[in-house]
């Protein structure tokens, strides 16, 4: 195995671990999930560019008769990238003590203010950061509102 194959293997493994954590791990951490809301997908064009670059590398590897393991690693890396960006839905998980947003756990006591913009974006002001939350369905904003009213 060459250095390139090792690096591809590491990145593929890291992306696979991230996908598993995002799908199953966050549900198990910090207690029971009380509310799950799907968010809008972002950065789709970035993934398309990434998969396009991987396709170029794959084509070059096949035409120059490169190592077969490199071909398999490039294909698996592209498939995981497609899964993460196009198949999986980003989500916001509400727990008893806080919520998961962008794979980070934020406790409720860190929230300083909450506002709703005209175009349906929930703005949560934290101590040093502002979260802009775009949900897929506007009804989910009402669910979030009722969750905060009932649980806080």
From Swiss-Prot:
Chief place where the protein resides: membrane
Cellular localization per UniProt: Cell inner membrane
GO cellular component, one term: plasma membrane
Keyword Nucleotide-binding recorded: no
Superkingdom per UniProt: Bacteria
Keywords: Cell inner membrane, Cell membrane, Membrane, Transmembrane, Transmembrane helix
Record's keyword annotation contains Transmembrane helix: yes
Membrane-protein topology: Multi-pass membrane protein
Family: Belongs to the UPF0266 family.
Protein name: UPF0266 membrane protein Spro_2816
Transmembrane segments: 6-26, 45-65, 67-87
């Amino acid at each position: 195995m060459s250095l390139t194959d090792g690096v591809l293997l590491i990145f593929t493994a890291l992306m696979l671990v991230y996908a598993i954590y995002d799908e199953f791990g966050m549900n198990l951490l910090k207690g029971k999930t009380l509310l799950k809301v799907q968010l809008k997908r972002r950065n789709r064009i970035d993934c398309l560019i990434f998969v396009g670059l991987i396709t170029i590398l794959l084509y070059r590897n096949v035409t120059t008769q490169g190592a077969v393991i490199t071909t398999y690693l490039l294909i698996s890396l592209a498939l995981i990238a497609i899964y993460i960006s196009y198949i999986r839905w980003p989500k916001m998980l509400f727990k008893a003590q806080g919520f998961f947003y962008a794979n980070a756990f934020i406790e409720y006591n860190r929230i300083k203010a909450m506002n709703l913009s005209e175009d349906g974006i929930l703005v949560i002001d934290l101590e040093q950061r502002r979260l802009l939350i775009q949900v897929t369905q506007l009804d989910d904003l009402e669910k979030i509102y009722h969750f905060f009213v009932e649980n806080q």
